[in-house]
Structure formats: structure tokens, C-alpha cells
Amino acid sequence: TQVEQLGTGHAVLQTKELLKNKKGHILILYGDVPNIKASTLMPIVDDHISNNRDLTLITAEIDDPSGYGRIIRDKNGNLLKIIEEKDCSDNEKKIKEWNPGIYIFKIKEVFRILNSIKTNNASKEYYLTDAIGLAQQSNMQIKAIKIANSGEVIGINTTDQLKELED
């Protein structure tokens, strides 16, 4: 239980005691993506495990990714980091590839990385998204997989959005 809500990274850290002696991988999804299908997730989880990655995340692309963290890549298309919209520059806000908040981590790596996260951002929270940049800097095995159907991973944050999804 997350008594104090100090960000998505902090929320995942609340599972540390439960998972400290576990081996394997953990699938982390934000609670506002009810439309994601197991048939979309399972091949990505299988790919993550079979390639022995430390971290895999799902990305998507839409015309207006307002409200979402942006995927930052280098000139060769390699994932560098995720920047939350509140912290984006005007140029970064133009990026259409965004973070729906679906990650697969090796359990042993997720907590090592999360223990390094700081709160030096606009919200003063522990962002799970900061784990991506830290993993990249640590030369961990990471991959961002862009899915074709962004409708599966659109976040539902209002009753109007939920009604639209149900229709």
C-alpha cells in the first residue's frame, strides 16, 4: 500500500519487501489502461524474457499525446529516456511517441534502479519513467517496443473518456 503518494517510482518501491527474494521478471502497468489485451502483452513479455533484457517498455504514437510522457531517442532511434510532459521543452512536446506506462523489468534490476531515482522534477515525485534514463546510463539491456494499436494503451482519466471507451 502506498500510504503517501510520492509518484509512480515510489508506488513500485512499495512492492520491494514482497518481491525481495523473488527471481524473474515483473510486468508493471499503470492503472488507467484498461483496454490492453493479453494477446498484445504476452508476445512482448516473451520477447523480453527470451532476449534476457533488463527492461522492456511499450510505446505508442498518436497525433496529440498531450498529457503523456514523451519517448526521447537518439539520432539512431535508440531509446534514451522518457520525459514527463510537465518537464518537456516546447520541442519535446512536439514528439508524437509517448509512454503508456507498461514496463517489464528483471526484478533484481528494478529496485536497484529505483533506489537511485531523485525528485528533481516539476512534480517533486519519484517518477518510474526516470528508471529508463538511469537504465540506459547503466548500460542495461533495454528496448522500447512501439505497438501499432495505440487505442489499446490510451489512458482513461475521466468519466467522459471511460464512457467513450465503453461506446
List PLM regions with ranges.
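Conserved beta-loop-beta/alpha segment of the NTase-like Rossmann-fold superfamily
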Residues: 1-78, 100, 104, 109-117
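Catalytic-core segments of class I nucleotidyltransferases/pyrophosphorylases
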Residues: 80-164
